[in-house]
Regions:
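N-terminal intrinsically disordered, cationic/polar leader segments
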Residues: 1-17, 22-24, 28-35, 42, ...
């Protein structure tokens, strides 16, 4: 759980950078930031335990995949709004993970 929270923290920071790069028209850096975000989302998906997690894990995987798809769109369309959408989804998920951590820790 600690690793998930660390990944989420890095992901949210990198999403902010990607958004800033779009607004600043720094397209090469935008691409690097979005690629880092996608790598982190893929790592989060890889960490899911599909054998034991049931429907919750399947839904998390779908949410992560949706975020990856939206980031590809954000990159191609230079859309800070799509990055904002991803940040909103992920901030809600992060709150859930933090709440779980508080109950377990």
């Amino acid at each position: 759980l600690e690793l998930v929270l660390v990944l989420f923290s890095g992901l949210m920071d990198e999403l902010e950078r990607a958004r800033s790069h779009i607004e600043g028209r720094r397209f090469e850096k935008k691409a690097q930031s979005i690629n880092k975000c996608i790598d982190i989302l893929n790592a989060l998906t890889s960490s899911l335990e599909f054998e034991t997690g049931g429907e919750l894990v399947v839904n998390l995987s779908r949410l992560y995949d949706h975020c990856v798809y939206r980031l590809y769109e954000a990159s191609g369309e230079l859309s800070a709004e799509k990055i904002d959408e991803v940040m909103l989804i992920l901030s809600n998920l992060r709150e859930g993970w933090e709440g779980l951590s508080g109950k377990l820790g």
